[in-house]
């Protein structure tokens, strides 16, 4: 076996969305990085939908940007439609989403990585890990090469023993057209990693020229919406396209119902559990049998292709059923399928062997990120890649780990959830997973997290100073409006009080009091309005967080023997030993741990501290 002459600080295995963030941020932080991928032409490939963001997910992309990651930048460069979802709802659940050109997304990401100093990219398929007495030392590849590394970041996506299903036919693959990885999964099993199966799926792609868009609802984008933090409204660099909405018909339901036994999902071919919030069309027909129709969103895959992503028609039906099903949908009567829908099963590792830093508990220096940890979605994967890359570098330099808390970020919510829960389905981020979501809005991600990005060396001083200046300006304006009183309606009130009324907007106040209300630009105007309008709720959540911080920050020693704490319930002893939470707050969120057990543990920790 040939040994590569260069020893790297960080080796990243896989070049999906997790791997790209891990490789970029590691190199940006000043270490030598090698990224290995089985195909250089599929770097950052959007394997499923041609979109980034959405509810919860868009918040994560903004947080990645605030910390100095690259998903937001590449999305803005590649976007062919930008929207804000939930505009009629409260600010906590409003979220940016972009349709992107799949080819351009790959091209922009590959170019960015290739031009990152300290980052080497190479085509090779990793088959096994190398370690010395439980400490990672490198990897070996199918090609017969060995690479040495102080740390390894594993981001294998759906490739570990990936199995593709189309009806009763199944075959090995990491995604349609790409081989799966067999050796790596076997190597991890031999090392004692608990591994189970999950499933995901993707709908068929259709030829645009064969679709009758005239009978569908057109869905254009919104102006001025991007992902990278800016002071002024975003101007997309690419031409913008519309999506279209149609729906299934009674005939669609009949076709699917008559062929359920031929679905890989319902025919018993699939053992892995699929994502609850992204069900297949056959799942929707069965679970929502009272509904006569289901929405289908037709999303363009790019500017230079006619392929259309049929969002809402994910299925594992055989191709002949897919053909009939597609042609039963309104406007798709003559649709031509360019790529079939399929389901894919893959291996993932249980969260109880992963630290919140995303370092493995079984092999020191091995970090895991993305779908290997049981998540689904590009955004969740990218965020994990960022955290894994940061902490791999911290490991190399013997620095303290970086773990954003669930009180300050959706990324922190995800890290905590993944390492304190046993997943029975792929994990997807929603705003409802956060206890303090009004504080974790998509518009204030930079205010919350940019100081970390700057301290880590991922954000430039210029960018950080801009964020600080904006934060200071918002705070000064908020105080000024609280102290400025004017006649408004029947009474004299502060302008902040006037703005807090539901029917009053910042623009309305600017028109009424042009000498008192400053125009800070559309982006800051909107943020200031939300901060003032919801200040009562925000202040209450901040007080609640302060009261919880003591429990959240109370560290649990790694060598604590839970069996010796006899007042703990047997279930609590077993689950605490299994997950080994870092803090009392994390312990409290493990399923099956009662509040009485937390009280007992708190007393035990205080006694332990005295000793």
Swiss-Prot record:
GO terms for biological process: tRNA methylation; tRNA wobble uridine modification. Its main location: cytoplasm. Gene3D superfamilies: FAD/NAD(P)-binding domain, GidA associated domain, C-terminal subdomain, tRNA uridine 5-carboxymethylaminomethyl modification enzyme MnmG/GidA. The keyword Cytoplasm applies. PROSITE patterns: GIDA_1, GIDA_2. Pfam families: GIDA, GIDA_C_1st, SAM_GIDA_C. Homodimer. Heterotetramer of two MnmE and two MnmG subunits. It is found in: Cytoplasm. One of its GO terms (molecular function) is flavin adenine dinucleotide binding. It comes from Chlamydia pneumoniae. This is tRNA uridine 5-carboxymethylaminomethyl modification enzyme MnmG. NAD(+) binds at residues 274-288.
């Amino acid at each position: 076996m040939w040994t590569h002459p260069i020893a790297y600080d960080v080796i990243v295995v896989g070049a999906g969305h997790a791997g790209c963030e891990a490789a970029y941020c590691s190199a940006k932080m000043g270490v030598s990085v090698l990224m290995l991928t089985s195909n250089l032409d599929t770097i950052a490939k959007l394997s499923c939908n041609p979109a980034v963001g959405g509810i919860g997910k868009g918040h994560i992309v903004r947080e990645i940007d605030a910390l100095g990651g690259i998903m937001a930048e590449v999305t803005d460069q590649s976007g062919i439609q930008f929207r804000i979802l939930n505009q009629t709802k409260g600010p906590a659940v409003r979220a940016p989403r972009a349709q992107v050109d799949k080819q351009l997304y790959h091209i922009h990401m590959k170019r960015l990585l290739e031009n990152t100093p300290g980052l080497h990219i190479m085509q090779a398929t990793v088959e096994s890990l190398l370690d010395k007495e439980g400490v990672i030392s490198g990897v070996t590849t199918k090609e017969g090469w060995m690479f040495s590394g102080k740390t390894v970041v594993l981001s294998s996506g759906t490739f570990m023993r990936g199995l593709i299903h189309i009806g009763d036919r199944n075959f090995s693959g990491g995604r349609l057209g790409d081989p799966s990885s067999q050796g790596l999964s076997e190597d991890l099993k031999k090392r004692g990693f608990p591994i189970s199966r999950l499933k995901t799926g993707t709908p068929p792609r259709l030829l645009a020229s064969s679709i009758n868009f005239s009978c569908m609802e057109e869905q254009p984008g919104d102006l001025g919406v991007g992902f990278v933090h800016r002071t002024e409204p975003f101007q997309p660099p690419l031409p913008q396209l519309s999506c279209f909405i149609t729906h299934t018909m009674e005939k669609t339901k009949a076709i699917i119902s008559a062929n359920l036994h031929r679905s890989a999902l319902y025919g018993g071919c699939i053992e892995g559990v699929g994502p609850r919030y992204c069900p297949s069309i056959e799942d929707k027909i069965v679970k929502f049998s009272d509904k006569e129709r289901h929405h289908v969103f037709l999303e363009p895959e790019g500017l230079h292709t006619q392929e259309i992503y049929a969002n809402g028609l994910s299925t594992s039906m055989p191709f002949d059923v897919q053909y009939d099903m597609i042609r039963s949908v309104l406007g798709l009567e003559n649709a031509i399928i360019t790529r079939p829908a399929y389901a894919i099963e893959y291996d993932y590792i249980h969260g109880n062997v992963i630290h919140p830093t995303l370092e493995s508990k079984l092999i020191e220096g091995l970090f895991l990120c993305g779908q290997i940890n049981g998540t689904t979605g590009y955004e969740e994967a990218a965020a994990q890649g960022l955290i894994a890359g940061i902490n791999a570098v911290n490991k190399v330099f013997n620095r303290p780990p970086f773990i954003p808390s669930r009180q300050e970020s959706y990324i922190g919510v995800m890290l905590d959830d993944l390492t304190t829960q046993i997943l029975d389905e792929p994990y997807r981020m929603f705003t409802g997973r956060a206890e303090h979501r009004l504080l974790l809005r998509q518009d204030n991600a930079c205010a919350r997290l940019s100081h970390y990005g700057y301290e880590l060396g991922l954000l430039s001083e210029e960018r950080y100073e801009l964020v600080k200046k904006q934060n200071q300006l918002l705070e000064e304006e908020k105080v000024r409006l609280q102290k400025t009183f004017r006649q408004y309606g029947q009474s004299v009130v502060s302008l902040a009080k006037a703005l807090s009324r539901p029917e009053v907007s910042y623009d309305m106040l600017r028109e009424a009091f042009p000498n008192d209300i400053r125009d800070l630009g559309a982006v800051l105007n909107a943020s200031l309005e939300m901060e003032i309008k919801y200040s009562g709720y925000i202040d209450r959540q901040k007080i609640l967080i302060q009261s919880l911080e003591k429990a959240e920050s109370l560290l649990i020693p790694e060598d604590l023997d839970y069996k010796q704490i006899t007042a703990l319930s047997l279930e609590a002893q077993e689950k605490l030993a299994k997950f080994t939470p870092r803090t009392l707050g994390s312990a409290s969120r493990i399923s099956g741990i009662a509040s009485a057990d937390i009280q007992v543990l708190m007393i035990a920790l205080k006694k332990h501290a005295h000793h």
